[in-house]
Curated annotation (Swiss-Prot):
SUPFAM superfamilies: alpha-helical ferredoxin, NagB/RpiA/CoA transferase-like. This is Lactate utilization protein B. The keyword Repeat applies. The lineage of its organism: Bacteria, Bacillati, Bacillota, Bacilli, Bacillales. GO terms for biological process: lactate metabolic process. One of its GO terms (molecular function) is metal ion binding.
């Protein structure tokens, strides 16, 4: 599994990113802009809650009948001259794609943005096979040029970089001579990429939605790079998660409308591309050969469980853009290509609790993510369910938490210990108290009091106050 992007543990990653003041400022600013645009776009559409309910209904229906629609998709792709491969694991998907590359004697591959190819670590496999792989999405291209810096956001992978940093990367790696103006940076990237499109042997894309009734794939972009990736190379390979499918064009229209408004606050992105198999005889562009790789990689294990709603995700990152935890720690702290609330739910399911057991706790459970989700995934409830699984089934609760709960249980079950504790606590905590607040808690309380106010216990216990008033004191 190549979802993991950093070998450091969760607490080390968080500590590093909490001190990255630029990153935190960039994330906060981006969240504000994207959230505001989303609200404006939703209001303009009208009946937003009805649209959300329809999106949820479409995704739930598709998942409940996923085997049927995948078979229909496969048959229709084959009817139109395409090749379909169902990959149960990342290794199977990578091996199939590598074999196609070897068969075609391909040396250069251009790619449009694809989270699932990041998930299976496809680029590294193809580079090991002797291929040059070029990312053509501008954000992904910037990260690739910058020594394969991992993405920090599902929609805007280079969110953690500013224009000055990008300018410096381009100057160091690409011989860039101009300023940090975004227009000049984009034009330079365009100039560098144009040659790559024209000389590529294979184009690889992701898939926003596959359409079962026609065997088509839908690509949603703002840069037009996916059109060039699919139009110019002779061979096209599309890689999709098995859940990224809709029954018909009608459902696709609904989900695209929800996606573009939720992701970037637009009615539609600049390009909505629908492709159906290889080129027909007489066509002047498009691939001569088309391969569709449908990736499971743990998704089938989620079907039929309490976590199935996470597969409704349309990768809009609306949940990321409202998350207060993501706002402070950024995407790299999650240690996964999937960050934010959706990453905190999905990463343990696909990558396992050993690597991602901390992520469900990286949430205030404020439910802002659930309210923002255009297909109504109950993200905060799924995070809570993860915590339950970690504690009850995996036995992953921290030792400090186990000891604290045992101590509380012991004290709460004994009236003598409870009374003693309530008497002793104010005096015992006096060394840590400042202005009626515990400013530096002992032991496990330290992590809490570093970032939150913790009121000191009152010196007068309620039971003493109550007893005094029962004697006929103040009424």
């Amino acid at each position: 599994m190549a979802m993991k992007i950093d070998g450091a543990n969760f607490h080390e990653r968080v500590e590093t990113n909490l001190h990255n003041t630029f990153m935190r400022g960039a994330v906060a600013g981006a969240q504000e802009r994207l959230h505001t645009r989303r609200l404006e776009a939703a209001e303009e559409l009208g009946n937003w809650e009805e649209w959300r309910a329809l999106g949820e209904e479409i995704r739930q229906h598709t998942l409940e009948n996923l085997d049927y629609y995948l078979m229909q998709l496969s048959e229709n792709v084959a009817k139109r001259g395409g090749h379909v491969f169902f990959a149960q694991t990342a290794e199977e998907a990578n091996n199939y794609i590598r074999n196609v590359v070897i068969q075609k004697n391909a040396k250069k591959i251009v790619k449009s943005k694809s989270m699932v190819t990041e998930e299976i670590n496809l680029n590294a496999v193809l580079e090991a096979a002797g291929c040059e792989v070029i990312e053509t999405d501008l954000g992904e291209y910037i990260l690739q040029v910058d020594d394969h810096d991992p993405p920090s956001h599902i929609v805007a992978p280079a969110l953690h970089k500013n224009k000055e940093q990008i300018r410096d990367v381009f100057r160091q790696k690409l011989g860039y001579k101009q300023t940090e103006k975004p227009e000049e940076l984009a034009l330079h990237a365009r100039k560098m990429l144009r040659h790559e499109y024209l000389t590529a042997d294979i184009g690889i894309t992701g898939c926003n939605f596959a359409i079962a009734e026609s065997g088509s794939i839908t690509l949603v972009t703002n840069e037009g790079n996916a059109d060039l990736v699919t139009a110019l190379p002779k061979t096209q390979i599309t890689v999709m998660g098995m859940e990224r499918i809709v029954p018909t064009f009608e459902e696709m229209e609904v989900l695209v409308s929800l996606l573009t408004r939720s992701a970037v606050g637009q009615k539609l992105t600049s390009y909505i591309t629908v492709l159906t198999g290889p080129r027909d005889e007489g066509d002047v562009d498009g691939p001569e050969e088309f391969h569709l790789v449908i990736v499971d990689n743990g998704r089938s294990n989620i079907l039929g469980t309490e976590f199935q709603p996470v597969l409704q995700c349309i990768r809009c990152a609306a949940c990321v853009n409202v998350c207060p935890v993501y706002r402070h720690i950024g995407g790299h702290s999650y240690g996964s290509i999937y960050s934010g609330p959706i990453g905190a739910v999905l990463s343990p399911l696909l990558g396992g609790y050993d690597d991602y057991k901390e992520l469900p706790y990286a949430s205030s459970l404020c439910a802002a993510c659930t309210e923002a989700c255009p297909v109504k995934i109950p993200l905060h409830e799924l995070l809570l369910k993860h915590r339950q699984v970690i504690v009850e089934r995996e036995g992953k609760a921290p030792i400090s938490e186990k000891l604290a709960m045992k101590a509380f249980g012991l004290g709460a079950s004994s009236s003598f210990l409870y009374k003693l504790g309530s008497k002793v606590a104010p005096s015992a905590l006096t060394p840590f108290t400042n202005d009626d607040r515990i400013s530096k808690g002992p032991g496990p309380l330290k992590a809490w009091t570093e970032i939150r106010e913790f009121p000191a216990p009152n010196k007068e216990r309620f039971r003493d106050w109550f007893r005094e008033h029962q004697k006929g004191g103040e009424k």
